[in-house]
Amino acid sequence: MAHKKGVGSSRNGRDSDGQRLGCKKFGGELVKAGNIIYRQRGTQIHPGNNVGCGKDYTLFALIEGVVKFERLGRDRKKVSVYPS
């Protein structure tokens, strides 16, 4: 049994596809009810006024309006939707 792999073979060459996380609607943008605002793993950003949170922590608009990102104290952020 060879203790070296044959020439040309490699243990590299794999990479998984990205998960398309992040901000989908930015501050000041108009959204409709149900529009996804932010996709995340865990609550990097918390839901504020008129924003729902899915079981995978996706934040989505509950009403039609304008997106606004705000601070929750020193180290937390929230996103709200206000009627336009």
Swiss-Prot record:
One of its GO terms (cellular component) is cytosolic large ribosomal subunit. The keyword Ribosomal protein applies. GO terms for molecular function: structural constituent of ribosome. Coiled coil: none annotated. One of its GO terms (biological process) is translation. InterPro entries: Ribosomal_bL27, Ribosomal_bL27_CS. Residues 1-21 are annotated as: Disordered. Keywords: Ribonucleoprotein, Ribosomal protein. PANTHER family: LARGE RIBOSOMAL SUBUNIT PROTEIN BL27M, RIBOSOMAL PROTEIN L27. Belongs to the bacterial ribosomal protein bL27 family. This is Large ribosomal subunit protein bL27. The lineage of its organism: Bacteria, Pseudomonadati, Thermodesulfobacteriota, Desulfuromonadia, Geobacterales.
